[in-house]
Amino acid sequence: GIAGFDHIDFLEEPAAAALHYHASSESRHSTLVLDVGGGTTDIAHAQIGGRGEEPVIHRAWGLPNGGTDVDLALSMAHFMPLFGKGDSRIPMHHFVDAAMVQDMPRQREFHKRGFADVEAPYRERLLSLQRDGGTTRLYRGVEGMKIELSAHGKSQHALEYIDPALSVQASRDDLVTASESFLGRLTTLLQEVRDALPAAPDSLFLTGGMSRAPYVQ
C-alpha cells in the first residue's frame, strides 16, 4: 500500500466537509455545504446526521473562482497603479503576471521582462518588484489588506521594500468593489442551486477561509 495504507479515497472538498459535519450531527437532516476557498468555490447538497447512518451527497456544483480573484482585483485597482498600471505604456498583462503568484508561468514571464525603457519612477519600482521575493511580498500585502478591510473601514500597507516612501491605502468600499465580480458569479451559482433543490435545506454549513468574509456572508 501507499505509505502503509491499503486503500485511499480522495474526496472533493464539499464532500469532505459534509462528512465532517455528518460526524457531529446527531439528527438526520438535509444540508447545503458551501466551501468558499482561495481558488475555487464548491457547493454540495447532502443528507447527513443520524446514528449509524451514512451521509448521502445528492449533488455538487462549483466555480473556478474564490478569494484569489478578490486579491487580484484589489491588487490591480490599488497596488499596480503604483507600478505604472494605467499611467504608462506597459501592457496590462505584465501587471496581472506580477500579481498572480500562484501561476508560475505568469511569474516567469514577469521576471524575465525588461523594464529599462519604462519611465521613472515606475522603472525602478518594477525592477525592485522583480527581485527575489518581491511579488510574494506584494501578494501577502494585498491579502493582508483584504483581511484587515474585512474587519476595519480603512487599511494602509507600506511598500518599503520597493521604495521607503511608498504605501497603499484602501477602504472597505474599495474591497467591496474588488469583490463585485466574484460575488456576481457566486450569486448566479447560488440561484442555480436554489432552482435545482426540491426544497430548502434544513441547514447551511459554511467552510473555507472566504466564507468568513462579511461581504460574502
Give residue spans per PLM region.
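Conserved phosphate/pyrophosphate-binding and hydrolysis machinery centered on Walker-type P-loop NTPases
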Residues: 128-135, 168, 172, 210
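A contiguous, well-structured pocket-lining segment that forms one wall/lid of small-molecule binding clefts
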Residues: 151-181, 188
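Short, glycine/acidic-enriched loop or turn micro-motifs at the edges of active sites
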Residues: 16, 38-39
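Short glycine-/polar-rich loops that comprise or flank the Walker A/P-loop
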Residues: 29, 41, 70
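Phosphate-binding glycine-rich/basic clefts of nucleotide- and phosphate-handling proteins
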Residues: 47-161
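Short beta-strand scaffold segments in enzyme catalytic cores
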Residues: 42-46
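N-terminal phosphate-binding loop and flanking beta/alpha elements of the actin-like ATPase fold
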Residues: 1-33, 47-63, 173-216
